[in-house]
A protein has these predicted regions:
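Short secondary-structure boundary/capping segments
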Residues: 28-34, 50-55
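Short alpha-helix plus adjacent loop in nuclease-associated cores
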Residues: 42-63
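Acidic/histidine-rich catalytic cores and adjacent linkers
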Residues: 2-32, 40-44, 63-179
Length: 179
């Protein structure tokens, strides 16, 4: 309101975190503006879901939080990285942890889901990235892993703002948040 109507009329795209308060403020004050979920925050939601699965499976299988020497605890930092950045040694560590126990398959599937989400954002072609994102929206909410299904429901709830990323030439608030 301080900047005036002319400024508000000039705002065409607004990137935001997946927080309902931001969306409500945007709808109230800039109702013709296209809302776009910021890629960093969406990928962070995916990474957080993977970590929640890892911690739950760790607790369920061993009865305690992660400790040095526990397979899933040992890969916790690797799980935060993008698949394209992993060394051969890190890939081998992931594979060893995922195959150590049958229950670890949940962590593997969760990690693959998060990587698919990252791939949508990283794809060089916007149309292909959007197709990957649409597939994510269709598949994650029905995932039998509760944390991943919750992520899928969250993304489905934000569907328009999530998919707007590919319609607005990769709009991001990274520059603003870096200040």
């Amino acid at each position: 309101q301080e900047r005036g109507q002319e400024f508000r009329d000039g705002v065409q795209v607004a990137t935001l975190d997946p927080f309902a308060g931001y969306k409500k403020a945007l709808d109230d004050e800039l109702d013709d503006t296209v809302a776009v979920l910021d890629a960093f925050h969406v990928v962070k939601l995916g990474t957080t879901a993977v970590d929640e699965v890892r911690r739950r499976v760790q607790q369920d299988t061993l009865g305690h939080r992660g400790r040095r020497g526990d397979a899933l605890y040992g890969i916790r930092n690797i799980l935060r990285a993008g698949q394209e950045r992993l060394t051969d040694r890190q890939k081998a560590r992931l594979d060893a942890a995922f195959t150590q126990r049958e229950e670890h398959v949940e962590v593997d599937v969760a990690w693959q889901a998060a990587q698919q989400l990252r791939d949508a954002y990283r794809h060089a072609d916007l149309a292909t990235g959007r197709k990957i994102a649409e597939h994510v929206l269709e598949s994650l909410p029905t995932c039998p892993i509760p944390e991943i299904a919750r992520l899928g429901r969250t993304l489905r709830q934000w569907r328009a703002a999530f998919l707007s990323y590919w319609d607005t030439d990769r709009s991001s608030n990274g520059g603003t948040e870096a200040v």
